[in-house]
A protein has these predicted regions:
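Short, glycine-biased loop/turn motifs at secondary-structure junctions and
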Residues: 1-218
Length: 218
């Protein structure tokens, strides 16, 4: 079975695990080559990065990627790697990975598994599936982190519902978890967020969010 056939088999598996086979899976089953498959992935990206298919991709794609890499990269889709020059067209899927994955330029990264991701330049990172994901936002990077742990520095922007550390001219919108704010530009906290900061300057609390003194041990 070729790597492309393995991906189509994964589509069958995803269909069997959903009450009604999603249009995206049916479209993937009709594809005849990896170029067509990548076009369907882009059209139905939410299913690829957030649906049941994401779990199957996390398990099966890394083994098939070396063979499919050239064609996938031609479509602007990468797995556990990112080119230094990466326009907004570039999308990176990060699966379970035992090395740091650097995201550059304007690429958009979607974390599916347990991994460490460093975001640079104006890149974007989305982490909504793995509690063990670790994300570092540098430069002007943006992060949407509902699962995992994140540190934001420089002029990064962060939306988070997970535990986070801020240490720079960072803008943060927190909707849960614990936020340790060593340095920041603006912090808005809501839900049950617990904020640890040296002062309340430029911090807005809503809902049940609370603020506590930031001490050296933190």
């Amino acid at each position: 079975m070729t790597p492309f056939e393995l991906l189509k088999t994964a589509c069958h598996a995803a269909c069997r695990q959903t009450p009604a086979c999603a249009p995206s899976y049916r479209a993937m089953l009709k594809t005849e080559n990896i170029s067509q498959m990548m076009a369907v992935w882009r059209e139905y990206w939410e299913d690829i990065s957030g649906g049941k298919y994401a779990d199957i991709i996390n398990d099966r794609l890394p083994a098939a990627y070396p063979t499919l890499r050239k064609e996938m990269n031609a479509a602007g889709i990468y797995v556990n790697e990112c080119p230094k020059m990466a326009p907004e067209f570039v999308r990176v899927l990060v699966t379970d990975c035992d090395r740091i994955v650097d995201i550059h330029d304007y690429a958009k990264c979607y974390i599916l598994g347990n991994a460490i991701v460093y975001a640079w330049d104006h890149s974007q990172v989305y982490s909504e599936r793995s509690d063990k994901a670790i994300i570092a936002l540098n430069d002007h990077a943006y992060g949407y982190v509902s699962k995992g742990w994140v540190i934001a520095v420089n002029a990064a922007q962060l939306w988070t519902a997970a535990d986070a550390v801020l240490n720079g001219s960072v803008t943060c919108e927190a909707h849960g978890g614990t936020v340790k704010a060593y340095a920041y530009r603006k912090l808005e906290a809501s839900g049950d967020t617990q904020v640890y900061a040296a002062s309340e300057r430029n911090i807005t609390l809503d809902g049940n969010a609370t603020i506590h003194p930031l001490v050296k041990e933190d």
